[in-house]
Amino acid sequence: MFYDDNADLSIIQRRKVGVIGYGSQGYAHSLSLRDSGVQVRVGLPEGSKSRPKAFEQGLDVDTPAEVAKWADVIMLLVPDTAQADVFENDIEPNLQPGDALFFGHGLNIHFELVKPSGDVTVAMVAPKGPGYLVRRQFVDGKGVPCLIAVNQDPTGTGEALALSYAKAIGGTRAGVIKTTFKDETETDLFGEQAVLCGGTEELVKAGFDVMVEAGYPPEMAYFEVLHELKLIVDLMYEGGIARMNYSVSDTAEFGGYLSGPRVIDADTKERMRGILRDIQDGSFVKKLVANVEGGNKQLEVLRKENAEHPIEVTGKKLRDLMSWVDRQSTETA
């Protein structure tokens, strides 16, 4: 683990950093780098809706190509599916020997969708939290833990540069963990698919379906399997599974011990291993690339199917009754 004393902020302060993208992570990185005394410019296309926001926050903004030409450290923070095109069209033609190309996620490097030349440092600085939290913690004098990795290091200074960058966005205040592009990519994808997004979503929908099919009102089913999920996740987030079990009733704890393994059993774990194998051997990324090359048609079909599930209809109706819910961030249609 690395902390403030292990990182030299002056290293990144002597460089010119171009942040390509101004989404959740892009704005947090850009503003925190600037506030740490780093020269920073934001790369956004001419028609980007994020341009006014970046200008309003006092940042220098130019096209991705111009920023890549100016910078000697480029942090690529556009979505995974757009990175290869941005690299090919805007970044690669402007890379110089000795430049550094940074990523917030390892997918495109690990699966060789982006292939920088050997005279460019390739590294990753990945905060383990959303951009708003990275920025809020930085402003409060704290930080969000970060992962760093170096995939290509022609000058032998990649780790020091990555640590310096992490310090500039507050990461070393909380702690920085050294990893590899392979481990970060594969664990991140597996967590998303098997547990956080895919697994949880299907578990919730299945629970809803079982209750409704058994004759219970859909509103009751929604409250029990989706709405109350936040209460449980918050407890686990704050103190682990033990904290959650300590905080719920004895009835809930005892029932969970008995019934949980009936839902998630050895067969489930074997299917999860299959998901991990598909990630490790590149099968998933091939499907991802094929979807993008096909105009996202498969993704749009899946989104439509998901949006039409009865739990979404019920949920929208119930959330209309919840004045405390931020509807702007929760409603997608």
From Swiss-Prot:
CC per GO annotation: cytosol
Pfam families: KARI_C (PF01450), KARI_N (PF07991)
Keywords (A to Z) from UniProt: Amino-acid biosynthesis, Branched-chain amino acid biosynthesis, Magnesium, Metal-binding, NADP, Oxidoreductase
Sequence positions that bind substrate: 249
EC number(s) from the headed UniProt entry: 1.1.1.86
Protein's GO biological process: isoleucine biosynthetic process; L-valine biosynthetic process
Location of the KARI C-terminal knotted domain: 180-325
Enzyme class at the top of the EC tree: oxidoreductase
Claim: RNA-binding is one of the keywords in the record: no
Catalytic activity: (2R)-2,3-dihydroxy-3-methylbutanoate + NADP(+) = (2S)-2-acetolactate + NADPH + H(+); (2R,3R)-2,3-dihydroxy-3-methylpentanoate + NADP(+) = (S)-2-ethyl-2-hydroxy-3-oxobutanoate + NADPH + H(+)
A GO MF term: NADP binding
Nuclease found in the keyword field: no
Cofactor: Mg(2+)
Superkingdom of the organism of origin: Bacteria
Positions with a binding annotation for NADP(+): 22-25, 48, 50, 80-83, 131
Residues noted as binding Mg(2+) 1 in the record, renumbered to the chain: 188, 192
Pathway: Amino-acid biosynthesis; L-isoleucine biosynthesis; L-isoleucine from 2-oxobutanoate: step 2/4; Amino-acid biosynthesis; L-valine biosynthesis; L-valine from pyruvate: step 2/4
Residues reported in the UniProt entry to bind Mg(2+) 2: 188, 224, 228
Coiled coil residues, start to end: none
The family this protein is said to belong to: Belongs to the ketol-acid reductoisomerase family.
PANTHER family attached to this UniProt entry: KETOL-ACID REDUCTOISOMERASE, MITOCHONDRIAL (PTHR21371:SF1)
Protein's UniProt name: Ketol-acid reductoisomerase (NADP(+))
Organism (species): Mycobacterium leprae (strain TN)
Gene designation per UniProt: ilvC
